[in-house]
């Protein structure tokens, strides 16, 4: 008997599953509180953190590249740094995030994540303000861009590690180049006048979301910096000898941590699979016994996002490593479609294609773009991407690596994957031909080399951003019904941090002001409709009569809006030639600037315009038998805007005025077009050389899932390579920080919930792994939205689920907390 039949359909299955697990989720708080009560019986050695011997010397006395912290003459061996761990695991959609929300709401803890996407997703779920955004665990302990090129050590001296203390030192030694650099900087900063207290001094409870994608040594790194920072700043936590409790959250069966390294001497990269934190906590006997994982493990069992019984049963068999019955293998046959059908871009346009390799993704994009170019060329955008090479830094870099014959072009092609987010250039249809030219300054000197490539994207395709990107929200595109729903629910206001609510009210007021005249132009508007519209009460707003539109630009800050109203014709001038003038614009001729109004005045203006807008909507709905609400509304903030066939979006006053916001990787966006017009307060322009603008640098226009239109700031990133302790800023990349979601690798899709998926495993897949099958198929919530080119379970595949047997053992353990 199913849950839904038990309750006669009164409650849906998702609701029942969530409610049934709520009580146990609250018990996690008690579990964490108990672990966080532990304290050291005896203190750590006095000032141990000021002079620390390189731990590699304890395993290999002949080690030459010693990097001790502090004064090497007084350096002492690192003492063992104790810690506690609570492990929280479960499949996709099982409720792990709800446990983090409960911990954040009911305990004093530091919430972090392993990736920027996970961190920003948590920030949204926890409704964090801009000043309290969830950070990545790397940023939390002090990692920055200069550490990216610091390779991890590969120790060959240790064969067996018999104690947790030895294991801790060995893991710290692996990452010691980064640890020592961060610690040295912290010691120097502590001697300065201004002291910034690190986040790790806030609480002894540290939550790490998506812990399965980072290597095991990061666990000991977090423990090290907890004790290091608290000791350095003499916090109450350190004085009370409070032992940290690390809460590791993730899915060990679908995770995979990678070790990547780059050898500047050979210009070769190496990527291989590593041992992640979750796998180490579960499989490593020494670590598992020390942390008492058998007692401190919480497992979420049921996938609450997917309530299809058969599909959930199938995923559970793979998750827990249960034998696959013949009927389950036959069940997967229903998803199979011909490979030619899936690979044809004209079929299943709304589906995201998932492939096993970057090469297959890139090949699909090439076919797709060729087809779009033939059928509708205006829908294919080609955007330039620029790379500025610093000539002197490049020459110094060549000398440092003793590769004197290295040229810019081969270096560029070899290092393309390092110049920006790897998958952005590995997956996308980036032009093979590159243009290389020297940038000649006014005095005739040449200091930089410019490399130009081109990326292709499709209009109205699904995209994401590669990092948190500054944007200006300037408009709305959707149905009248959707816009009115947003106004009535105050959803946009609620999603805006409270300190910026005044700008949210002003922005929505500007959208209503810009969209008000569209009621007069609707195909459903008749003389009777206009008569009723004229009868709508238009209150007198005294401050609108006294406000002046002239405000000096010097009085603005980055969060203010700027409306260059004197450039555009006034509404009174536009209405003078209108045979059917709109009484709204005759009454309210100008909309004042945000920074000359009080919050009370802006909120009053918003309330008045909202009542007028909704009243007009109700009139049109009634006269059109509710057909008007389905029609499209496109409105921009106090601006008239037009769109060209080629996709360029133009403001009639050559500027866009919007609300400063941020696009984040956790969200989905639609590519609307691009613009060359000025966008107030997107300040990348000042950072770039004039030659970039002469070549052409558009700004990307996107639409979010609610329908709000934003213009993205251009993305500027720098590649700094570190060799022998010396840093070289070699290249600056100027692009758009966007990546297509039309197709991607299965690995990249991990952690994403995708509406509709078409899986392509290739014609004869080699090295097919069960984890890839699981990740690809579990992206969908509804199995009716999944198709595949073959049934991978009928092929030879590697069962790489080494965790499954441990999970099954834990399920039988009475001390494991199971949450269904």
UniProtKB/Swiss-Prot annotation:
Entry GO terms, CC: host cell nucleus
The protein's Enzyme Commission number: 3.6.4.-
Binding annotation for ATP: 90-97
Cited InterPro entries: AAA+_ATPase, DNA_helicase_dom, HSV_HELI, P-loop_NTPase
Entry similarity comment: Belongs to the herpesviridae helicase family.
Function of the protein: Component of the helicase/primase complex. Unwinds the DNA at the replication forks and generates single-stranded DNA for both leading and lagging strand synthesis. The primase synthesizes short RNA primers on the lagging strand that the polymerase elongates using dNTPs. Possesses helicase-like motifs and therefore may act as the helicase subunit of the complex.
Name of the featured protein: DNA replication helicase
Native source species: Human herpesvirus 7 (strain JI) (HHV-7)
Lineage of source species: Viruses, Duplodnaviria, Heunggongvirae, Peploviricota, Herviviricetes
Gene behind the chain: HELI
């Amino acid at each position: 008997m199913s849950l839904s039949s038990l309750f006669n359909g009164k409650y849906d299955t998702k609701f029942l599953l969530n409610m049934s697990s709520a009580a146990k989720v609250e018990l996690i708080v008690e579990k964490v509180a108990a672990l966080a009560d532990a304290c050291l019986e005896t203190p750590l050695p006095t000032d141990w953190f000021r002079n620390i011997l390189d731990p590699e010397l304890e395993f290999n006395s002949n080690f030459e590249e010693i990097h001790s912290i502090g004064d090497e003459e007084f350096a002492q061996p690192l003492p063992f740094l104790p810690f506690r761990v609570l492990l929280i695991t479960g499949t996709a959609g099982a409720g792990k995030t709800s446990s983090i929300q409960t911990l954040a709401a009911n305990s004093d803890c530091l919430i972090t994540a392993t990736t920027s996407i996970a961190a920003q997703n948590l920030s949204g779920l926890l409704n964090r303000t801009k000043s309290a955004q969830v950070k990545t665990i790397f940023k939390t302990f002090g990692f920055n861009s200069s550490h990216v090129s610091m390779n991890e050590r590969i120790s060959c001296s240790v064969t067996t590690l018999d104690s947790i203390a030895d294991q801790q030192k060995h893991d710290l030694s692996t990452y010691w180049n980064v640890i020592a650099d961060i610690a040295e900087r912290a010691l120097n900063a502590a001697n300065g006048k201004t002291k910034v207290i690190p986040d790790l001094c806030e609480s002894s409870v540290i939550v790490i979301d998506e812990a399965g994608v980072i290597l095991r040594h990061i666990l000991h790194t977090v423990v090290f910096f907890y004790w290091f920072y608290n000791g350095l700043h003499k916090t109450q936590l350190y004085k009370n000898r409070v032992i940290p409790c690390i809460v590791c959250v993730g899915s060990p069966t679908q995770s995979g941590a990678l070790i990547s390294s780059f050898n500047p001497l050979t210009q070769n990269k190496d990527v291989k699979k590593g041992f992640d934190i979750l796998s180490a906590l579960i499989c490593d006997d020494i670590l598992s016994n020390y942390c008492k994982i058998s007692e401190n493990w919480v497992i979420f069992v049921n996938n609450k996002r997917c309530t299809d019984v058969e599909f959930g049963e199938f995923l559970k068999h793979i998750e827990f490593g249960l034998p696959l019955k013949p009927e389950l293998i036959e069940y997967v046959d229903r998803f199979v479609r011909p490979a030619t059908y899936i690979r044809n871009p004209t079929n299943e346009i709304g589906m995201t294609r998932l492939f096993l390799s970057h090469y297959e993704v890139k090949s699909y994009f090439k076919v797709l773009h060729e087809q779009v170019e033939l059928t509708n060329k205006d829908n294919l955008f080609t955007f330039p991407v620029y790379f500025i090479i610093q000539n002197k830094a490049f020459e110094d870099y060549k000398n440092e690596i003793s590769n004197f014959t290295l040229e810019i072009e081969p270096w560029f092609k070899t290092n393309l994957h390092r110049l920006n987010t790897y998958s952005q250039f590995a997956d996308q249809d980036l032009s093979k031909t590159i243009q290389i030219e020297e940038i000649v300054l006014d005095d005739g000197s040449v200091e930089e080399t410019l490399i130009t490539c081109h990326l292709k994207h499709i209009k109205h395709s699904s995209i994401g951003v590669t990092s948190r990107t500054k944007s200006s929200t300037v408009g709305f595109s959707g149905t009248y019904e959707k816009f009115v729903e947003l106004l009535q629910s105050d959803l946009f206001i609620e999603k805006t941090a409270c300190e910026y609510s005044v700008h949210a009210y002003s922005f929505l007021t500007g959208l209503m002001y810009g969209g008000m005249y569209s009621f007069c132009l609707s195909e459903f508007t008749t003389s009777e409709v206009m008569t009723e519209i004229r009868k709508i009460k238009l209150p007198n707003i005294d401050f609108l009569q006294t406000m002046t539109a002239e405000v000096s630009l010097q009085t603005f800050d980055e969060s203010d809006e700027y409306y260059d109203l004197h450039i555009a014709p006034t509404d009174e001038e536009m209405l003078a030639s209108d045979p059917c003038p709109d009484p709204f614009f005759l009454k309210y001729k100008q909309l004042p600037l945000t920074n000359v109004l009080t919050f009370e005045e802006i909120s009053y203006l918003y309330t008045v315009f909202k009542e007028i807008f909704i009243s007009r909507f109700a009139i049109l709905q009634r006269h059109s038998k509710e057909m008007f609400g389905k029609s499209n509304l496109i409105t921009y903030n106090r601006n008239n805007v037009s769109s060209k066939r080629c996709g360029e979006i133009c403001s009639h006053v050559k500027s866009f005025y919007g609300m400063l916001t941020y696009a984040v990787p956790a969200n989905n966006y639609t590519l609307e077009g691009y613009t060359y017009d000025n966008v107030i307060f997107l300040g990348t322009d000042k950072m770039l050389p004039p030659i970039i603008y002469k070549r052409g640098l558009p700004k990307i226009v996107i639409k979010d899932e609610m329908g709000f239109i934003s213009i993205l700031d251009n993305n500027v990133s720098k590649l700094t390579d570190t060799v022998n302790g010396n840093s070289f800023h070699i290249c600056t990349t100027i692009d758009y920080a966007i990546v297509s979601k039309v197709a991607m690798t299965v690995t990249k899709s991990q952690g994403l919930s995708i509406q509709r998926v078409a899986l392509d495993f290739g014609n004869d897949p080699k090295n097919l792994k069960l984890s890839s099958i699981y990740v690809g198929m579990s992206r969908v919530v509804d199995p009716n939205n999944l198709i595949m080119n073959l049934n991978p379970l009928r092929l030879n595949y590697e069962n790489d689920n080494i965790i499954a047997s441990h999970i099954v053992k834990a399920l039988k353990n009475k001390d494991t907390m199971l949450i269904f």
